[in-house]
Every structure is written in structure tokens, then in C-alpha cells.
Amino acid sequence: MIRLAKREDAKEIVPLIVQAIEDIVFMLTGTTSYEQATPILEYYVQSEQNRLSYHNCLVKEMDGKVVGVIIAYHSLELSVLDREMLEIISRNLNIQNVKVDKEADDEDFYIDTLSVHPGYQGKGIGTELLEGLLSFAKNKGIARVSLNVDQDKPSARRLYEKVGFKYEKVRFIMNHSYDYLVFPISKKIFETKVV
């Protein structure tokens, strides 16, 4: 079932985040190892107001286990969502005025992360999470959803295009190029229920 995440899901969500964003976790935590980053990521997921907060996550649960996650939020909320994270990065790196590259256009509901446990890949869970998120966004009156896909991951791009996302432009994040894909919500209505 696709459901809203709970605070206690953090320990299962964090490895999925790490799997999806890899070394970006170091930038988001101001650390240099996964061992250092993991407790900070768990804190982010458990927090009430953060880009990675459980409030921004939908999860796929099977057999009592979280096997997939999709994280999304409105781009205009990032200045508030990132406040505490930027303070943590600043403190850990001992630098002032840390900035994070802009990942989404202001009008977009942005998909930050989509990740499925390796043992459950190829079973349609990524598609189900995407469709659940799009259904959730439609019910909230959101007009457009966007995401960045690594240009080195053509299979991920195919998944997004299969669901209906379209290429809009190239975006550079942390000196790496990503294809920026968008989905106008009015285009399609999904029946995936989120509980």
C-alpha cells in the first residue's frame, strides 16, 4: 500500500534516500561519511519542517516493511524547509551563508527523491509511487509537478516519461547536469489511492 510516511519510518527511509542521491548526502549534512550522515538524515526525516521531513514523504509498504519512498514539496517552501538544514551544514563545515543550488522552478511541486529498495525493483513500485504522488498533488490542487533526472540514468528517465513527464530543460546542480522534467497535472488523473 502507498501511505503517508510516519516519523518512525525514518530508519527505513534513510537508506532509500542514500541509495537515490548518493554523495549528495554529504552536501545536505555537511559530513564526509555515510556513518556521519545517517543520524543527521534520520533527524531530517523525523523533523516537522525540512525538505526530507516525513510530512513530505509517501512510502510503499509491503509485508510491514517500507520498500519505496517518494519525497516532494512545493518549491516555494524551500526557504523555510531548508532553514534548519542550512544551519546544520554551516555548523558542520564551519562556514557561513551556505547556499543550496536551486532545484526547481518556483511554481512547481518538486519531486526531490524517488527510491525503491533493490530487492523490490522491477515490480512497478516506482511507477506506483509516482502515480500516488501525482494523485495526491491533484487532490491538493497542484498544477504542475517537476523533477530532475541524472543524465547518466536513462532508465530512470524512461520511467518518468512512461508516466507522462516531459523534458523541459537542463538544470545544473552541484556542477552536474540534470534533465528537468515536468508533468502538468491536468493531463492525467491517476486512481492510485494514498492512505
Please place each PLM-identified region on the residue numbering.
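C-terminal "cap" of GNAT-fold acetyltransferases
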Residues: 143-157, 162-163, 169-195
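Conserved acetyl-CoA-binding loop-helix of GNAT-fold acetyltransferases
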Residues: 116, 122-139, 158-162
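Conserved GNAT-fold acetyl-CoA-binding loop/helix
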Residues: 22-45, 56, 90-91
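A short helix-loop-beta-strand connector motif used in the catalytic cores of GNAT acetyltransferases and
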Residues: 46-59, 76-80, 110
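A short beta-loop-alpha structural element at the N-terminal edge
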Residues: 1-15, 23-27
